[in-house]
């Protein structure tokens, strides 16, 4: 059994295990996959976001298939917003999605600032149909890159 190591915020960071990351959108959810050993993220798939039931059935299937130890959700932070400003609708939706992931699947959820992930994915040459999965990959890679060694 591996021991977890605390990250800079005191949370336990596994030494190994799979991570799934999500770029939540009202119509589509990009998904990426990575692990703590290689700390490399790969675009995995795009889930249609049609109904709550279909969304979590699809996520549940991915969780059964990949057995992640942690989930990462991109948080669309507004760089212009101040600390006392009301949370934007896109932030509320992403936070709600992450909280629902935690509640439904009992897995820890981490948040990553994803404000430029879709733009970075497009600039990196991601095809239009793969943009959301590539944005999720960028979110997950940022998460890995910010972990202590």
Swiss-Prot record:
UniProt keyword Endoplasmic reticulum, yes or no: no
EC number: 3.1.-.-
Alphabetized SMART domains for the sequence: YqgFc
Keyword Protein biosynthesis: no
Residue intervals passing through the bilayer: none
GO cellular component assignments: cytosol
Keywords: Cytoplasm, Hydrolase, Nuclease, Ribosome biogenesis
Annotated GO biological process: rRNA 5'-end processing
Disulfide bonds: none
Catalytic EC class: hydrolase
GO molecular function: nuclease activity
Cell compartment(s), UniProt: Cytoplasm
Gene3D superfamilies, per database record: YqgF/RNase H-like domain
Reported function: Could be a nuclease involved in processing of the 5'-end of pre-16S rRNA.
NCBIfam families in alphabetical order: RNAse_H_YqgF
Annotated PANTHER family: POLYNUCLEOTIDYL TRANSFERASE, RIBONUCLEASE H-LIKE SUPERFAMILY PROTEIN
Assigned protein family: Belongs to the YqgF nuclease family.
Name of the protein this chain belongs to: Putative pre-16S rRNA nuclease
Species assigned in the record: Cupriavidus metallidurans (strain ATCC 43123 / DSM 2839 / NBRC 102507 / CH34) (Ralstonia metallidurans)
